[in-house]
């Protein structure tokens, strides 16, 4: 427990002053060893309020007296004690920040914390198979599902500010604490806004990363460092839609708030895919198609309501992702329609995320060609003035990256705003609108 104490205090910077507040003159935290119920690793109990606003609680921990049961056999007894100490002491910190915070946020971040200090143990993998089989459950579901929701905070940790952002979530929770309202999503959103993101954006990105499930740099920012070690390859796909030449319609009558559906696509001919909302606001749902290119570590992500996919480019797998991203209602229904699409000689990945934030000072788009051709790229500002141009030579079956350093033809940095990309190939012209933010 001393290792855990110093890790959270010194390495991660959490406020540990609650020790002296709850044990005046003692400055020690109470930990007991007890004969706990089967399958309980430990229990953290709250005591009295320790601040004037009555939102911060003292606590103590009961550890079990042995880890011999079947639930603890994946790792050694010493490893069980280590990850349990991390998990439960993080609960003690959480109670001292906001005694009223929701259990899902407490448990998901406590599981996340285990891997921060004891990265080599990986006992938290145990929660992943069930969680990935149940993506249609809300991320804040407070059954055992909430333990697997650590994956959201793992994504935030790896891509949106590291452990400092998780700490900031708890600092916001402490500031927002009250006994009446759910402040978990407000606190998460405030912390993510401080790093140029939001809860909705992070949730959408995590849903994509969960399907790609790779650590390969080509998939960035939809990666996990330990993806290849995870005991899952992706979420459960609730339906498989096979398209050859007949129109297909698939409806889903219930999608809960903060949950997602994954739908497998099996295409043997060019397909036009449309997603329409039957119940709920259009902007409340995020839609994307993710597909992996055959025989290479490359993925394409297209967001929106209407897509054209030509499988002749070579697709290993393709999945529709539909994620609810609003707190304004609690259920949605939608319909997916697949009909004959068009063959494509030039494929330009839709920019995602859009708006694009200039934190990397480089804009990247990918182009795929099914023939040998020259590509001319022109970028225009909102006034219609050309500010940049570039040429690419693409070979049949080749994918190339177009990298733009966000400078105009004169070498000056561009300002935030809306820009239009005109892409002219041998026989096709495409226009993409991109919002770029400082």
Protein language model features and the residues they cover:
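A glycine-anchored, Pro-Gly-centered beta-turn/N-cap motif
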Residues: 314-316, 398, 415-418
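Signal that preferentially marks extracellular ectodomain short beta-strand elements
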Residues: 68, 308, 402-414
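Surface-exposed loop/edge segments in extracytoplasmic proteins
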Residues: 294-303, 385-391, 429-430
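Glycine-centered coil/turn sites that cap beta-strands in beta-rich domains
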Residues: 341-381, 389-404, 425
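Acidic/His/Gly-enriched intrinsically disordered linker/tail segments
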Residues: 49-56, 79, 83, 98-160, ...
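Beta/coil-rich, acidic/histidine-enriched accessory regions frequently appended to metallopeptidases
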Residues: 175-343
């Amino acid at each position: 427990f001393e290792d855990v104490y110093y890790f959270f205090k010194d390495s991660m910077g959490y406020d540990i002053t609650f020790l002296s507040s709850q044990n005046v003159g003692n400055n020690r935290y109470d930990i007991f060893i007890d004969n706990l119920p089967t399958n309980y690793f430990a229990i953290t109990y709250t005591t009295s309020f320790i601040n004037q606003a009555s939102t911060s609680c003292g606590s103590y921990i009961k550890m079990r007296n042995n880890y011999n049961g079947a639930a603890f056999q994946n790792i050694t007894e010493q490893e069980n004690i280590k990850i349990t100490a991390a998990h439960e002491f993080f609960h003690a910190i959480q109670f001292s920040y906001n005694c009223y915070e929701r259990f899902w946020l407490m448990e998901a971040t406590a599981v996340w914390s285990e891997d921060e200090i004891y990265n080599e143990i990986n006992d938290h993998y145990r929660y992943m198979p069930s969680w990935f089989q149940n993506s249609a459950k809300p991320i804040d579901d407070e059954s055992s599902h909430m333990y697997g929701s650590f994956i959201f905070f793992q994504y935030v940790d790896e891509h949106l500010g590291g452990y400092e952002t998780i700490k900031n979530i708890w600092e916001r929770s402490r500031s927002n604490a009250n006994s009446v309202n759910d402040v978990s999503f407000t606190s998460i959103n405030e912390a993510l806004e401080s790093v140029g993101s939001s809860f909705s954006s992070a949730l959408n990105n995590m849903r994509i990363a969960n399907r790609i499930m790779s650590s390969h740099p080509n998939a960035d920012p939809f990666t996990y460092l330990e993806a290849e070690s995870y005991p899952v390859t992706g979420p459960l796909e609730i339906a498989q839609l096979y398209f050859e030449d007949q129109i297909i319609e698939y409806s889903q009558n219930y999608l809960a708030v903060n949950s997602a559906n994954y739908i497998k696509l099996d295409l043997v001919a060019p397909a036009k895919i449309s997603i329409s909302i039957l119940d709920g606001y259009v902007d409340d749902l995020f839609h994307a198609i993710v597909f992996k290119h055959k025989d290479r570590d490359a993925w394409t992500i297209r967001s929106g309501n209407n897509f054209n996919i030509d499988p002749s480019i070579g697709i290993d797998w393709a999945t529709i992702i539909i994620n609810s991203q609003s707190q304004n209602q609690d259920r949605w229904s939608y319909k997916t329609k697949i009909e004959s699409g068009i063959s494509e000689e030039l494929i330009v990945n839709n920019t995602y995320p859009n708006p694009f934030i200039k934190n990397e000072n480089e804009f990247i788009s990918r182009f795929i060609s099914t023939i040998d051709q020259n590509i001319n790229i022109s970028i225009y500002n909102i006034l219609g003035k050309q500010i940049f141009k570039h040429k690419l030579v693409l070979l049949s079956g080749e994918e190339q990256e177009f990298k733009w350093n966000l400078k105009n033809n004169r070498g000056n940095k561009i300002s935030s705003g809306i820009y239009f990309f005109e892409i002219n190939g041998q026989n096709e012209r495409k226009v993409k609108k991109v919002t770029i933010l400082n």
